[in-house]
């Protein structure tokens, strides 16, 4: 649709290749097909605006959010989520990694599709008190405020992680259109805010290792959190609105 639009708003420079690169239409490591004339024309319309996020993101009270889930002030907490329907591979890996024993509290928003099955499996493990399973969480800002680390896919919601200043283990969905989740994840990883695990490599032991190594390195986790905050674009909605108003004049 880009050739038909007057502006194309992008969450990440990797999608639009940065404002400067967008003007040339080239991308780092781009395939030759991506440098076609129509793409170069489309690139002139790209604006790396960021993605608007809910106003409460990054502003919820951490102590209150933790009290809601019954998580202590000094506990480490990992948030796992995969979208409204959930992500089965993430769901299975999280339960395998943290269901029986865990170095941290876990908030797991499973999505509706897998929730009942995961609940039965968790009950079979004795319903461990450190594992907080929900089909969804509303307001989601509370879950973000309670967490120290996130395990998630790499769709548009990663901008909420940036706004909340949260480091992440990202598992891109491999069948997303044009594999855009891998592009998102690698951009965030290169910025120092995430570790990327390919979907085909994810299982319980791998997830436990990745999370365990990050939680055991608080300085690294803090640096990743700072890198995440640096990616945030809190004025994304205003920038998009300004561009649209300018076009309408």
Spans of features found by a protein language model:
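Short glycine-/small-residue-rich Rossmann-like dinucleotide-binding loops
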Residues: 13, 83, 111, 154-155, ...
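A short, well-ordered alpha-helix in the C-terminal region of glycosyltransferases
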Residues: 220-234
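Active-site-proximal region of nucleotide-activated glycan assembly enzymes
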Residues: 1-62
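Short, glycine/polar-rich helix-capping loops at beta-to-alpha or helix-loop-helix junctions
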Residues: 11-19, 157-158, 178-185
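Donor-nucleotide binding loops and adjacent catalytic segments primarily
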Residues: 27, 34-36, 62-149, 182-186, ...
């Amino acid at each position: 649709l880009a050739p038909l639009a007057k502006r194309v708003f992008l969450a990440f420079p990797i999608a639009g290749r940065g404002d400067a690169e967008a003007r040339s239409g080239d991308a780092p490591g781009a395939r030759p097909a991506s440098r076609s004339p129509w793409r170069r024309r489309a690139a002139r319309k790209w604006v790396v605006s960021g993605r608007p996020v809910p106003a409460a993101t990054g502003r919820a009270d951490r102590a209150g959010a933790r009290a809601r889930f019954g998580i202590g002030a000094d506990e480490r907490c990992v948030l796992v989520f995969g979208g409204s329907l959930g992500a089965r591979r993430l769901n299975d890996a999280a339960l395998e990694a943290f269901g029986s024993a865990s170095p941290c509290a876990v908030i797991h928003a499973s999505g509706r599709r897998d929730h009942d099955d995961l609940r039965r499996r968790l009950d079979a493990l004795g319903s461990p008190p450190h594992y907080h399973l929900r089909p969804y969480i509303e307001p989601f800002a509370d879950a973000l405020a309670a967490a120290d680390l996130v395990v998630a896919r790499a769709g548009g919601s990663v901008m909420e992680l940036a706004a909340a200043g949260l480091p992440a283990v990202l598992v891109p969905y491999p069948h997303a259109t044009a594999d855009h989740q891998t592009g998102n994840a690698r951009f965030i990883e290169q910025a120092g805010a995430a570790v990327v695990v390919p979907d085909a490599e994810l299982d319980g032991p791998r997830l436990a290792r990745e999370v365990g190594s990050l939680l055991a390195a608080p300085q690294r986790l803090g640096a990743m959190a700072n890198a995440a905050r640096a990616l945030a674009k809190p004025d994304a909605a205003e920038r998009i609105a300004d561009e649209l108003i300018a076009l309408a004049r």
